[in-house]
Amino acid sequence: VAGIVVDFEEFGYRSRVLIVNTNRIELSEAPKSIKDLVSRKWKNKVAMAYPLFGTTATHILALKEAWGSEIWESWCEGLVANKTKIVDGNSMVVRLVGAGEALLGLTDSDDLAVGLSQQLPLASIPLENELCAIPNTVAMVKDAPHSEGAMSFINYVQREEILADLVENSALISAKLPPEENAFQSIFWPGILAEEKESFSFLRDTFLR
């Protein structure tokens, strides 16, 4: 974004979550790692959004950086071989798992919150070392024609009472940035971007067959 935006800010965060249908799975029987999603035990029982877009893409690319290419490619191919349900978005993952059409799903914390507000039988599995925190970001485009209005908005969304409302309504997990001990805080994002074209080519070939 260098040279494109100015006044780039980070505030608060959501997170990726692995969810389960609590009517169908005891939490003690749930996977201990997202690497287990390729196990035959979970064949045709896992849902996730297309890994080419949005937070799912961010998470999947971060896993490549964390695990290395060989393990990551094998895991992605394993998801396909295990007949993972690839759907149009994170909210659809919540609906499928809530309805029992899938037993497990990768989604976002705010989508899970919506499902819980609808009394769906859902819970998340604490796998912080494998689940990507998603800081909120806001920025103004360089030479924006309405820079004063843009700056007013940037300041507004970071006001303490606005952040408190976002947390209260589960749009954010916290008004603060993710804790430093979160494994994905140390991910080398320039490395991810350097391999982005190659990574997306692999994902298209793997998931869009």
Name each model feature, range by range.
Residues 1-6, 114-126:
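Ligand-binding "clamshell"
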Residues 98-121:
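A ligand-binding cleft/hinge motif common to bilobed small-molecule-binding domains
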Residues 17-24, 134-149, 165:
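A bilobed periplasmic-binding-protein/Venus flytrap-type ligand-binding module shared by bacterial periplasmic
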Residues 14, 44-51, 75-80, 86-87, 118-144, 156-177:
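Periplasmic-binding protein-like
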Residues 1-101:
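Extracytoplasmic ligand-binding site segments that recognize negatively charged/polar headgroups
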Residues 178-209:
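Extracellular/periplasmic bilobal clamshell ligand-binding domains
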Residues 24-26, 44, 52-56, 110-113, ...:
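Solvent-exposed loop/turn segments at secondary-structure junctions
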